[in-house]
């Protein structure tokens, strides 16, 4: 199938791009034809993102500033310790009488009414506490009275701890003689709900969570517990509101030192959490990687991860007192080859549980990269999946629209599976430039989400698409030039073969790797069909002999036109690889590529002879041959000569290199045999499922065998994942190991529903990667 013929007008020019792109940026104009507008946009945007790595910004919090404003002076308890915070509250009330995110584009819509209620009530209490701002108090009360029904509305999204914090503030307001026009029954109901929530936390032994929201408990909280959760900087979980409440109720000097340091840094208003630099920079790395633009920021990413690893080794509180940061740090460090254990993450999830959806979400992502030996200590980590499924099915109304979608996608598309470029496209299309986060109140950081990331990701995606289209055209010409399209017995899968590498080795500079991968993918498909149905045993043997001899007279040595076409195409591809790889490796690797092809064809010949002779091998005998005959060797092994690092003969012949290949190929063979069992059984072909049924325990049915084999695939995958991620003792460069890992993702994709190439459902996905424009679904939507 020629994909180009399936798509009308596939070549998208700059002018035919979707309007979404022009909405993101104003295109640069060239001067005298010397400046490429796209390159100028990319370079300028990269510079802006690089600056974001140096300066972390976070919005101030009306809610937390109000709690800091309530703190009395140690020397004069009837006076505020931080009068500048009171002045800030007076000067930053919103037009409708509420307090919330200041200078925020969506604030006027009150996407989180409960957040506005708790922030506004905290500000009213702070002002009343010191008898200032009477006009602001009255306007705030009017807002609360108009929206108080939302406090008990289960369909409204809730900040963390709202069911404890808001009733606590109501009680505090009542003690200050603040008269809210609310029904006594509603007030009693909220207090009762607070009591139930407190009991639930105690029964589940999540005292750390109660400490985090302790300002809502007042006299119900044992303030002596503060020391257990007090960090070295004097704060309670880096929360200004909890720390302020702790000082008000316990006069802990460390708490006051923390609050003073906050005001020294931020002036007259504070954020909802501080410090947050490490988490924000990790979020930047995560976002950049998800959007497919990490190749632009390799130095910045390494600097962030090196610093994070230093903090991990030193057991820095920024990591180990917060589930979200710990889970994110663990995942990014492990994926990038740093030696980290999940034990600390398991410990913190046991202590703090999942205080919000983001905590569960990040922990679930981390659970995807646990090794087999991690599973016993990571039971609490694995519970994150159940938590996410539970909130989707029973309590989805309290989730924001954005988080709800993130949870759905996390469960549907696990973070460590799937094809890189498919994930990138989906992440770009769903990206929200106004990703406001929710803790006890909402906050925003331009480091976490902004238009620069999206602008660069879109331009980069289209740049890559234009490269892919040209490479695919060249491959289609190569197929015709080598007469492979004339082999009627063979499947024509040029677009599929190219797609499999464009979706994984996506960077522009990896063009040689993509061409090598795709050419050999095309050839292995054709050769597989030749050994399967297109050739006689004599022809198969003749083809192998020609490759072994190499310098042959095709007119004399090839026994048929089919053999002639196949040999010349193989020689053309192998010689091209040898010539181009020399530029990367500074040595001739042609003999290794030839040997890889010979290993494949000999394994295929062995299977053909077994079939001819009606020989039934043992399962072990079959698998030792079948992982090679699955034909991934010629695709992956030559391609890794083009991904960057130099590969010595020692590396290529090492047991580590062989194990990488065997684990990858075994997974592929088992997936293929599971999905093609019924068809191959009818055709009388050898298959692992059939052999397992015939050689295994009596009475086993197909479903049981398939279940066992799927578990085997899962274990092989975890074993391979460990080989890929771990650097200690490894001699195969990471970029090369990633090629084996990427092929596993390709296999999972192709065998998700059908037995590899026999399904047509992937055609739309192929178009998405190579041809179709992006559709930015969040561009004109309100965030919540």
From Swiss-Prot:
Accumulates in leaves. It comes from the Eukaryota. Binds 3 Mg(2+) ions per subunit. This is Ent-kaurene synthase 1, chloroplastic. Involved in the biosynthesis of ent-kaurene diterpenoids natural products such as oridonin, miltiradiene, eriocalyxin B and nezukol, known to exhibit antitumor, anti-inflammatory and antibacterial activities, and in the production of gibberellins phytohormones. Catalyzes the conversion of ent-copalyl diphosphate (ent-CPP) to ent-kaurene. The lineage of its organism: Eukaryota, Viridiplantae, Streptophyta, Embryophyta, Tracheophyta. It is an enzyme of class 4 (lyase). A motif (DDXXD motif) lies at residues 528-532. Mg(2+) 1 binds at residues 528, 532. It catalyses: ent-copalyl diphosphate = ent-kaur-16-ene + diphosphate. Pathway: Secondary metabolite biosynthesis; terpenoid biosynthesis; Plant hormone biosynthesis; gibberellin biosynthesis. Its EC number is 4.2.3.19. Mg(2+) 3 binds at residues 672, 680. The gene is KS1-1. Keywords: Chloroplast, Lyase, Magnesium, Metal-binding, Plastid, Transit peptide.
């Amino acid at each position: 199938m020629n994909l180009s013929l399936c798509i009308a007008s596939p070549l998208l020019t700059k002018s035919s791009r979707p309007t979404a792109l022009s909405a993101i940026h104003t295109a640069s104009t060239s001067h005298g034809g010397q400046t490429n507008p796209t390159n100028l946009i990319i370079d300028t945007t990269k510079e802006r993102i690089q600056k974001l790595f140096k300066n972390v910004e976070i919005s101030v919090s009306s809610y937390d500033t109000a709690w800091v404003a309530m703190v009395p002076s140690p020397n004069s308890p009837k006076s505020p310790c931080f009068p500048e915070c009171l002045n800030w509250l007076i000067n930053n009330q919103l037009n409708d009488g509420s307090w919330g995110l200041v200078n925020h584009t969506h604030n006027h819509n009150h996407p989180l009414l409960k957040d506005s209620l708790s922030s506004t009530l905290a500000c009213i209490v702070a002002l009343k506490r010191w008898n200032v701002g009477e006009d602001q108090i009255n306007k705030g009360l009017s807002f609360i009275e108009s929206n108080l029904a939302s406090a008990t509305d289960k369909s409204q999204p809730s900040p963390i701890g709202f069911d404890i914090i808001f009733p606590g503030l109501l009680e505090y307001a009542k003690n200050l003689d603040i008269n809210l026009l609310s029904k006594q029954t509603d007030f009693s109901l909220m207090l009762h709900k607070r009591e139930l929530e407190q009991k639930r936390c105690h029964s589940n032994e999540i005292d750390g969570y109660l400490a985090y929201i302790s300002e809502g408990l007042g006299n119900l909280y044992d303030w002596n517990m503060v020391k257990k959760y007090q960090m070295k900087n004097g704060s309670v979980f880096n929360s200004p509101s909890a720390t302020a409440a702790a000082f008000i109720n316990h006069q802990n000097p460390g708490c006051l030192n923390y609050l003073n340091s906050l005001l020294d840094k931020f002036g007259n208003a504070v954020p909802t959490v501080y410090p947050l630099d490490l988490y924000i920079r990790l979020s930047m790395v995560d976002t950049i990687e998800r959007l497919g633009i990490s190749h632009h920021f390799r130095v910045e990413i390494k600097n962030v991860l090196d610093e994070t690893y230093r903090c991990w080794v030193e057991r820095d509180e920024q990591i180990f007192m917060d589930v979200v940061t710990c889970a994110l740090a663990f995942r990014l460090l492990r994926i990038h080859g740093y030696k980290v254990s999940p034990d600390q993450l398991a410990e913190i999830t046991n202590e703090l549980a999942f205080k919000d959806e983001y905590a569960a979400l990040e922990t679930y992502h981390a659970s995807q990269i646990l090794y087999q030996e991690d599973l016993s200590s990571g039971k609490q980590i694995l519970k994150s999946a159940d938590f996410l499924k539970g909130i989707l099915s029973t309590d989805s109304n309290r989730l924001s629209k954005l988080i709800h979608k993130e949870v759905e996608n996390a469960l549907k598309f696990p973070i460590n599976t799937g094809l890189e470029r498919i994930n990138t496209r989906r992440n770009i299309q769903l990206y929200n430039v106004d990703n406001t986060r929710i803790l006890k109140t909402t906050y925003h950081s331009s480091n976490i989400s902004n238009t620069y990331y999206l602008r660069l990701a879109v331009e980069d995606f289209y740049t890559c698409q234009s490269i892919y289209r040209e490479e695919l055209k060249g491959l289609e010409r190569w197929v015709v030039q080598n007469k492979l399209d004339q082999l009627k017995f063979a499947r024509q899968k040029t677009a599929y073969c190219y797609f499999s590498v464009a979706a994984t080795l996506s960077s522009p500079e990896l063009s040689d790797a993509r061409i090598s991968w795709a050419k050999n993918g095309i050839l292995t498909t054709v050769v597989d069909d030749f050994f399967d149905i297109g050739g006689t045993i004599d022809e198969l043997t003749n083809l192998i002999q020609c490759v072994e001899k190499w310098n042959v007279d095709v007119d004399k040595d090839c026994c048929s036109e089919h053999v002639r076409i196949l040999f010349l195409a193989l020689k053309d591809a192998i010689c091209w690889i040898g010539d181009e790889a020399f530029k990367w490796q500074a040595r001739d690797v042609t003999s290794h590529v030839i040997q890889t092809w010979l290993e494949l064809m000999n394994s295929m010949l062995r299977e053909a002879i077994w079939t001819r002779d009606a020989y039934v091998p043992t399962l072990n005998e079959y698998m030792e041959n079948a992982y090679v005959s699955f034909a991934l060797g010629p695709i992956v092994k030559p391609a890794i000569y083009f991904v960057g690092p130099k590969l010595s003969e020692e590396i290529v012949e090492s047991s580590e290199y062989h194990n990488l290949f065997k684990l990858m190929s075994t997974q592929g063979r088992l997936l293929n045999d599971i999905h093609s069992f019924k068809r191959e059984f009818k055709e009388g072909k050898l298959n692992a499922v059939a052999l397992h049924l015939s050689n295994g325990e009596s009475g086993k049915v197909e479903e049981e065998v398939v279940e066992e084999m799927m578990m085997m695939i899962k274990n092989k995958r975890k074993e391979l994942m460990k080989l890929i991620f771990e650097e200690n003792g490894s001699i195969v460069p990471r970029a090369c190991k990633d090629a084996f890992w990427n092929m596993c993702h390709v296999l999972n994709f192709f065998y998700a529903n059908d037995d590899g190439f026999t399904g047509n459902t992937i055609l739309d996905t192929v178009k998405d990667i190579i041809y179709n424009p992006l559709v930015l679904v969040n561009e004109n939507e309100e965030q919540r």
